[in-house]
C-alpha cells in the first residue's frame, strides 16, 4: 500500500507531500462553433514535512569478537576477521528488520488515523519530543461509523461495507481491498447471512471464502466478496510487534475494518548528512538506508549504524475509511 517511487527520495532535509481529491466531474457538451471549453486542473495540497530520524546501532567489542556467535559451530576455525564480517552481516540484517517494522507501523498508523505520532528518544529509555503528522485540517473525515456492531442484533456487515465502498466511489476513489482485524474476520466466518449468501445453491453469487496464508507475516487472504458490485479482496491481519514497554501490540486493531486500495500511499525518505569513516568532510545521501561505521581504535570497538528518515503519506485525500464494527469478544 505504500511503495516508494523514484520521486519519493529527496536530497533535502524535508520532503514534499502532495495529495488531492478524486474527480467526478463530467465533460461538457460543446457547440462546434465554440471550439472547446478549458477545464481546470484538479486542486491539490502540498505540505512540507521533516521526517523523523531512525538510527539503530550496534557496538562490537573485543570480548564479543572472541565469543562463539549464535548458530556458530563449537569449533568453527574462524579467525577474528571472519567472525567480524559475519557479525557485521548479522547486525545489518537485525537493524534492517527493525527499521522495516517501524515503517510498517508508520504505514498502518497513517492508514488508520490519517497521520501518526512519532515519539523521539534521547537514549534507550529517555523520551524526547513527540512529532505529530496529520494529513488533514481540523477533523478528519476518513472514518465510517457503523450504526450497530456487526456481531450484535441489527448489525449489517454487508450493508456497511457497501456504504463504505460507495463513499469512496462518490469521490472518484477506488475500493479494492477489505482489511479486517482478527475479531472481525472470526465473526464473518460464523455470520449466518454470509453463509447463506455464499451458498452456491442460492443462485446469488457473492464470492468465495478460501483462506490461505500470504507472503506477509500475519496476513491471511480470506477470499473475494461482492458488495453491491464492488469486488473486494478480503484480508485478515494478525501481525504484531513489541512496543516500547516490551508488550505485544497489533499493527491493525482486532475489532477494526477498512476499505482501501493498493498504492493508496507512498513511503518517502529525507536525506541524511554524516561524516563517513576516514573522511573529514560531510556527505549528504539521498537513500532509503544510510550505513555508517564508527571505529574507536583506543578502545578496540567498532559501531555500525543504519540511518533512515522515512515518512508514510497518503496519495489521495480521504482515500481510506475505517470503522470499529464489532464488539470485542471476551
PLM features: what roles do these ranges have?
Residues 54-137, 156, 160-161, 165-186, ...:
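Long, contiguous amphipathic alpha-helices that act as assembly "spine/axial" helices in icosahedral shell
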Residues 6-74:
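Assembly/oligomerization interface modules of large self-assembling protein complexes
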Residues 28-30, 190-191, 269-272, 314-318:
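Short conserved micro-motifs at the rims of enzyme active sites and ligand-binding pockets
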Residues 249-312:
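C-terminal structured domain segments
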Residues 4-27, 249-250, 292-293, 299-305, ...:
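Basic/polar low-complexity intrinsically disordered segments
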Residues 128-167, 192-195, 200, 210-233, ...:
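Contiguous, function-dense segments enriched for cysteine-driven chemistry
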Residues 320-330:
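Single conserved hydrophobic/aromatic residue that forms the stacking wall/gate
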Residues 171-271:
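Extended oligomerization regions of viral-like shell subunits
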Amino acid at each position: 500500500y505504500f511503495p516508494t517511487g523514484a520521486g519519493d527520495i529527496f536530497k533535502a532535509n524535508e520532503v514534499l507531500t502532495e495529495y488531492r481529491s478524486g474527480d467526478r466531474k463530467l465533460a461538457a457538451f460543446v457547440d462546434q462553433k465554440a471550439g472547446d471549453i478549458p477545464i481546470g486542473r484538479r486542486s491539490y495540497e502540498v505540505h512540507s514535512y521533516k521526517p523523523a530520524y531512525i538510527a539503530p546501532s550496534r557496538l562490537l567489542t573485543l570480548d564479543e569478537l572472541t565469543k562463539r556467535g549464535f548458530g556458530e559451530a563449537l569449533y568453527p576455525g574462524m579467525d577474528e576477521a571472519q567472525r567480524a564480517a559475519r557479525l557485521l552481516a548479522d547486525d545489518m540484517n537485525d537493524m534492517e528488520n527493525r527499521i522495516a517494522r517501524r515503517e510498517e507501523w508508520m504505514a498502518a498508523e497513517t492508514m488508520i488515523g490519517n497521520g501518526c505520532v512519532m515519539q523521539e528518544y534521547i537514549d534507550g529509555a529517555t523520551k524526547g519530543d513527540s512529532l505529530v503528522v496529520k494529513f488533514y485540517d481540523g477533523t478528519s473525515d476518513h472514518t465510517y461509523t457503523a450504526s450497530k456492531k456487526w456481531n450484535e442484533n441489527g448489525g449489517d456487515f454487508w450493508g456497511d461495507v457497501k456504504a463504505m465502498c460507495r463513499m469512496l466511489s462518490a469521490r472518484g476513489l477506488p475500493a479494492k481491498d477489505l482489511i479486517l482485524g482478527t475479531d472481525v474476520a472470526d465473526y464473518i466466518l460464523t455470520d449466518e447471512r454470509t453463509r447463506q449468501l455464499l451458498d452456491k445453491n442460492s443462485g446469488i453469487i457473492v464470492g468465495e471464502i478460501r483462506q490461505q496464508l500470504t507472503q506477509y507475516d500475519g496476513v491471511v487472504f480470506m477470499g473475494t466478496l461482492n458488495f453491491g458490485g464492488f469486488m473486494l479482496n478480503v484480508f485478515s491481519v494478525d501481525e504484531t510487534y513489541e512496543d516500547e514497554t516490551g508488550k505485544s501490540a497489533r499493527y491493525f486493531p482486532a475489532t477494526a475494518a477498512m476499505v482501501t486500495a493498493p498504492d493508496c500511499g507512498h513511503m518517502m525518505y529525507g536525506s541524511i548528512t554524516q561524516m563517513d569513516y576516514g573522511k573529514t568532510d560531510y556527505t549528504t545521501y539521498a537513500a532509503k538506508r544510510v550505513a555508517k561505521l564508527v571505529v574507536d581504535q583506543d578502545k578496540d570497538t567498532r559501531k555500525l549504524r543504519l540511518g533512515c528518515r522515512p515518512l508514510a503519506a497518503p496519495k489521495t485525500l480521504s482515500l481510506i475509511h475505517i470503522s470499529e464494527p464489532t464488539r470485542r469478544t471476551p
